[in-house]
């Protein structure tokens, strides 16, 4: 640079020119960049010939294209590690201001007569050949930057500098020391592209483009890159595991059941050959613990060592119908002792069974759960035949004994997964059931003779063979609500009928065993007349009939809530339920043993 030119240029232009000269040296001093570097000389060295107005518009078009290309190149050079601050964006606009200030100071000294021609200030810099050379240079630089970015985004392969000796550092951008300079440099960058025209061609709108386009250009570095890599690897591994399990389940479910049946048979033979001490586990293969179902039908003479096996895989919400297990797999295997199992072994084997892995690390599947089996509401369970729902032997353990046994630590798992694992096992159910059967409905109707408003604790005490949860409890409460509704409808009907027959005294009303009202109630609650209706129920029925008769006679039925006082009176007249109804084997004709 000539000394006069250095004197005439303002500080901002000199800074930009200094940066352009440094980048030109990095590009091996190519002729094109050297020629681009001379564009910032004082306009006193410009040729005296002027351009036509068409050439001036052509130069404006070329300058716009150059600005777009340089914006793309500059965006690829910048780092996404931090957003462009307001100070940096302001520095990108400084080169244009420096060039304008340079022209305004240099033109009066060397081109005084041409002050009014703005086209003369920009025209001589950009000849056709020079623009083509600069575009060619920018294309080469863009190609080099693309290769550099591809190398930087390759995972697990540490890229090296062109010399091959130093590893390239993470692409972090930093501003130059001068706040007026708009150039950004990348550490250890082998292909930096910049020139004097590059410093001045970035317009104020380009800074905003750079701010939003630099984020997806380069990959994150340092701890952020490590975190992203770990996330991708973990998600990929989990996806592969889930896909493998689903393929096994959907395409080959029977093979999984056959393998489980073989393993249980092998364990049964080991149990016969190696007797275990009482209270300890006879299994050394941990897979046996995972194949223990929640429903097991005990054989005669086979001891049940621990009642924790009765509820290892209980569903937390609603019951599952026994139809979920195929018919061919409901027969129990003989000589399969059920003994105490350590709690920590339960956790490991439950998780292994859910993941579908055996002890040898091989993946195995479970049969798909039919949509029809997912329905486990009480209407479906009530439609099951008694023979299917009551295929169990009497249990030697009392309910108090069952509740006193410690349970293994709970394993938090999805309800659908638990149901699919348990229903796929080749075992039948034990005495404790999760669904309600027609026998339970019949027993509830008989209990209505003694109590019209039972509590949940009373229901649990008189249904020891049912595994209670919210669905079971609410279903039984709904049963008794329906019983009461039918009962009150009949009482109101016969009270109005007595009033229409001309009866005016409520004391004349009574419910006898040969009356029509008793026949209707006995047919509904004691179908088949298998149970003798207690006398206390006849007294409660007569009292209810009188209460309805008095209310209708007094005209209280015009009030929408006229039945509530009657309900309150009847709710206080519940009597004790006989202890014989607690036995699951009560009434052999209804509850086959």
From Swiss-Prot:
Residues 24-48, 79-130, 153-199, 260-284, 298-333, 356-388 are annotated as: Disordered. Residues 492-591 form the Prospero domain. Residues 167-181 have a biased composition (Low complexity). Residues 433-591 are annotated as: Homeo-Prospero. Residues 433-491 form the Prospero-type homeo domain. The Prospero-type homeodomain and the adjacent Prospero domain act as a single structural unit, the Homeo-Prospero domain. This is Prospero homeobox protein 2. It comes from Mus musculus.
């Amino acid at each position: 640079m000539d000394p006069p030119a250095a004197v005439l240029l303002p500080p901002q232009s000199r800074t930009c020119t200094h940066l352009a000269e440094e980048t030109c040296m990095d590009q091996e001093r190519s002729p094109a960049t050297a020629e681009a570097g001379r564009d910032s000389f004082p306009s006193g060295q410009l040729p005296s010939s002027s351009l036509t107005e068409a050439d001036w518009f052509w130069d404006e078009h070329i300058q716009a294209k150059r600005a777009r290309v340089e914006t793309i190149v500059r965006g690829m050079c910048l780092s996404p590690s931090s957003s462009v601050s307001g100070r940096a964006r302001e520095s990108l606009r400084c080169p244009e201001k420096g060039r304008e200030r340079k022209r305004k100071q240099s033109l009066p000294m060397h081109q005084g007569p041409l002050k009014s021609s703005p086209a003369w200030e920009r025209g001589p810099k950009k000849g056709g050949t020079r623009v083509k050379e600069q575009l060619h240079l920018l294309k080469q630089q863009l190609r080099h930057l693309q290769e550099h970015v591809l190398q930087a985004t390759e995972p697990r392969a540490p890229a090296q500098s062109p010399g091959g000796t130093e590893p390239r550092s993470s692409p972090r951008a930093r501003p130059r020391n001068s706040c007026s300079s708009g150039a950004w440099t990348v550490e250890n960058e082998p292909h930096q592209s910049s020139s004097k025209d590059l410093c001045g061609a970035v317009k104020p709108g380009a800074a905003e483009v750079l701010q939003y386009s630099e984020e997806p250009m380069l990959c994150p570095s340092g701890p952020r890159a490590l975190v992203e890599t770990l996330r991708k690897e973990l998600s990929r591994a989990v996806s592969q595991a889930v896909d493998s399990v689903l393929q096994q389940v959907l395409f080959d479910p029977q093979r999984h059941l056959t393998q489980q049946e073989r393993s249980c048979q092998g364990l049964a033979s080991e149990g016969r050959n190696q007797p275990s001490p009482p209270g300890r586990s006879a299994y050394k293969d941990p897979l046996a613990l995972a194949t223990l179902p929640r429903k097991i039908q005990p054989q005669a003479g086979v001891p049940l060592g621990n009642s924790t096996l009765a509820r290892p895989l209980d569903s937390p919400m609603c019951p599952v119908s026994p139809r979920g297990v195929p018919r061919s797999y409901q027969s129990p295997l003989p000589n399969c002792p059920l003994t105490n199992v350590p709690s920590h072994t339960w956790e490991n084997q439950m998780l292994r069974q859910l993941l579908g892995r055996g002890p040898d690390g091989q993946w195995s599947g479970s049969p798909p759960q039919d949509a029809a089996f997912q329905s486990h509401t009480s209407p479906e369970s009530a439609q099951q035949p008694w023979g299917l729902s009551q295929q169990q032997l009497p249990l030697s353990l009392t309910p108090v004994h069952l509740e006193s046994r410690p349970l293994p630590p709970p394993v938090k798992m999805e309800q659908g997964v638990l149901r699919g694992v348990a229903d796929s096992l080749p075992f039948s159910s034990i005495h404790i059931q999760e669904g309600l059967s027609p026998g339970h409905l019949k027993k509830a109707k008989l209990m209505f003779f003694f109590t019209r408003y039972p509590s949940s604790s009373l229901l649990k005490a008189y249904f020891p063979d049912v595994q209670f949860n919210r669905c079971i409890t609410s279903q039984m409460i709904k049963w008794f609500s329906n019983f009461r509704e039918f009962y009150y409808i009949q009482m109101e009907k016969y009270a109005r009928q007595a009033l229409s027959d001309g009866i005016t005294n409520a004391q004349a009303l009574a419910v006898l065993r040969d009356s029509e009202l008793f026949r209707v109630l006995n047919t509904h609650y004691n179908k088949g007349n298998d149970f003798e209706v207690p006398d206390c129920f006849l007294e409660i029925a007569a009292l209810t009939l009188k209460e309805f008769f008095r209310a209708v006679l007094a005209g209280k039925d015009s009030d929408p809530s006229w039945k509530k006082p009657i309900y309150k009176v009847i709710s206080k007249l519940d009597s004790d339920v006989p202890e014989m109804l607690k036995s699951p084997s009560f009434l052999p004709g209804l509850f086959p043993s």
